[in-house]
């Protein structure tokens, strides 16, 4: 059991470092792994993306409700709790509450919305 827990921690650390690097590559230059030692201090798994509390998960089985509950329980007032997760051989995915996604979308200008639409057009057939 202890070996499994250690391997899980190493896998979690590797995922957090991978996600932080991905976010830096996308322009979030301050993204880095949070300083959590026991997972109980309320820090996000990946920090440095202003206004976003990121819980990072790298598991095959998706526990979206539990993960979101963790993010919402740890989030600082005014930040948006999200879960970013990845399964083997898949791309990273984002979990966010619908009402918070609506708030974000409503704050975008029409120009920003068009830019987003243009960028995702080619992603799907």
Stretch-by-stretch model annotation:
Residues 1-125:
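Catalytic phosphate/metal-binding cores of nucleic-acid and nucleotide-processing enzymes, i.e., regions
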């Amino acid at each position: 059991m202890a070996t499994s827990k250690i391997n899980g921690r190493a896998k979690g650390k590797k995922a957090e470092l991978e996600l932080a690097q991905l976010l830096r590559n996308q322009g979030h230059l301050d993204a880095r792994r949070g300083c959590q030692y026991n997972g109980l201090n309320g820090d996000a798994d990946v920090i440095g993306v202003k206004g976003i509390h990121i819980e990072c998960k790298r598991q095959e089985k998706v526990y979206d409700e539990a993960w979101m509950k963790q993010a919402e329980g740890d989030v600082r007032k005014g930040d948006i709790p999200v879960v970013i997760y990845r399964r083997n051989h898949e791309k990273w995915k984002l979990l966010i509450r619908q009402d918070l996604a609506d708030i974000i979308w409503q704050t975008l200008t029409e120009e920003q919305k068009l830019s987003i639409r243009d960028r995702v057009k080619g992603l799907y057939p």
